[in-house]
Regions:
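Hydrophobic core segments of alpha-helical transmembrane domains in multi-pass membrane transport
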Residues: 14-25, 45-52, 67-76, 103, ...
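C-terminal ends of transmembrane helices
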Residues: 20-35, 70-89, 135-150, 204-217, ...
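Transmembrane alpha-helix boundary signature
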Residues: 52-63, 75-86, 101-115, 175-183
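Structured cytosolic domains appended to multi-pass membrane proteins
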Residues: 288-465
């Protein structure tokens, strides 16, 4: 009687899970099928886990670990507020990198002789370590535990980054030279260097993210997501796991594409975002002419009540105030008042890719009403009222009017072209780019100061009276 080939069954399972990953990713491209796509991808991962258990020596131990980890993840997912999703995404990226980091570490400890496979092990640990510590740094920045760092810390971080990358390159080079016989090192010495390498990869991740400002966090999170996928793919190669390779490649490629798209939407290079920042991009000392024109909630209501077309532009201020539900309520009231309502969404508004989309989706705002700059800017001059809720740099006219501005050339939502602009803001503070916003001083601009949720609630109350 022939023995059943469990290895073949395992490979078939991996191929099936890879197909589910790809199909699920395809479904995520449409708002109507995104939820189903998420479930399809989740089922693909469950299938990959189950077939992996086929040749595990102690499946009970693995199932226990899965149960504990899954329970913790479920609790986090159920308890997290929608406004804290960026922090959660950063943590998930970090734990993905940490998994690859530990897997490669374990594989190194199992190796008794020096081989070229060690180069993959080193690469996996380096990328996984950067992803983990960099994601932790991003998490604390998003949580506002870490504020903007000093020039000294930024300068020190750059040198630490250079040192970490150089040390990693030398460690990988010495493995290649050792295998080729050009530089023979004892295994004990290599293990000592390896411990230093473990620490250096974590320090490099911190040095990479610490100097980056909060305004660039969406791009940072996207890149860290890509790195977590690359680390997973490398880990899959090390342990010859097909599902891990496919999943890692999908995450790595999609994350990198998204990173490039977001950088383009800011009209900046990745080098400028990660190694220069806004401060070195130019000067914003030009004197702004005009004066601030405050408006009360009662007067603001009269303006928007008479409007036939309104554009709502959400920003990080809406997320902080958790105002997405009252924003949706205001939009519904305006539509009931025979007003055309749309939402202007800038790709880098908020603190993560799609931050505003997530918040508005939670409030059940129709995806069809969400417009990007290229879609709404040509029609901006016929918009009666543009309501800017906690957005700053993404509506700053300096990007188009001041060649010396740090954000000059960045595509923005050109709300200053609307007939009336109503800006909801706590204070006159600048955005993360540190650039004063001439929009606030425009003749057609009115400032409604205060908490965004409270201000919009007052407008809603006026409509209901």
């Amino acid at each position: 009687m022939m023995d059943f080939d469990f290895t073949m069954l395992q490979q078939i399972g991996y191929i099936a899970s890879a197909v589910l990953f790809i199909y699920g990713l395809k479904m995520l491209s449409s708002e109507s099928s995104a939820a189903k796509g998420n479930m399809v991808s989740s089922f693909g991962m469950l299938l990959a886990i189950l077939v992996t258990l086929i040749d595990v020596i102690n499946p009970l131990l693995m199932l226990s670990a899965i149960l504990v980890g899954g329970s913790i993840g479920a609790v986090f997912a159920l308890r997290v507020k929608m406004t804290s999703i960026p922090e959660m995404v950063a943590l998930f990226n970090g734990f993905g990198g940490l998994s690859s980091y530990f897997l490669a570490w374990s594989e190194f400890n199992n190796q008794t002789e020096i081989s070229l496979v060690m180069t993959l092990t080193y690469l996996t640990i380096f990328i996984g370590g950067i992803t983990f510590s960099g994601s932790l740094s991003a998490f604390f920045k998003l949580s506002e535990v870490l504020k903007n760092t000093s020039n000294f810390v930024n300068s020190a971080s750059r040198w630490m980054l250079i040192f970490g990358c150089s040390f990693a390159l030398l460690c990988i080079l010495q493995i290649v030279l050792n295998v080729s016989g050009l530089l023979i090192l004892e295994m004990d010495l290599i293990r000592i260097l390896f411990v230093c390498f473990l620490i250096a990869s974590l320090i490099t991740g911190l040095a990479f993210v610490l100097p980056i400002g909060g305004g660039d966090m969406p791009v940072v999170i996207s890149l860290l997501n890509s790195l977590s996928g690359i680390a997973a793919a490398l880990a899959g190669i090390i342990i010859t796991n097909t599902a891990l390779i496919v999943a890692g490649c999908l995450v790595g490629a999609s994350g990198l594409v998204l990173t490039l798209i977001m950088a383009k939407s800011m009209n900046r290079t990745l080098y400028n975002i990660f190694f220069v920042g806004y401060a070195a991009s130019g000067s914003s000392d030009a004197e702004i002419e005009g004066e601030i024109k405050p408006i009360t909630a009662e007067d603001a209501f009269l303006v928007i009540e008479a409007a036939r077309s309104v554009l709502i532009v959400p920003g990080y201020g809406m997320a902080v105030a958790q105002a997405q539900h009252v924003v949706k309520e205001l939009g519904d009231l305006l539509e009931n008042n025979d007003c055309e309502v749309s939402y202007g969404i800038h790709p880098v508004a908020g603190r993560m890719p799609g931050h505003m989309n997530v918040l508005l989706a939670e409030a059940n705002v129709s995806y069809d009403n969400l417009l990007e700059p290229k879609d709404i800017n040509p029609k901006m001059e016929i918009v009666d009222v543009a309501i800017v809720i906690g957005a700053n740099d993404v509506v700053n006219p300096s990007a188009t009017e001041q060649p010396g501005s740090p954000i000059y050339g960045m595509p923005i939502l050109e709300v200053y072209k609307a007939k009336t602009v109503m800006v909801l803001k706590r204070s006159m503070s600048s955005g993360f780019a540190g650039v004063q916003n001439p929009l606030f001083f425009k003749e057609n601009s009115r400032m409604l100061f205060g908490d965004a949720k409270e201000s919009i609630s007052k407008l809603v109350a006026e409509f209901k009276e």
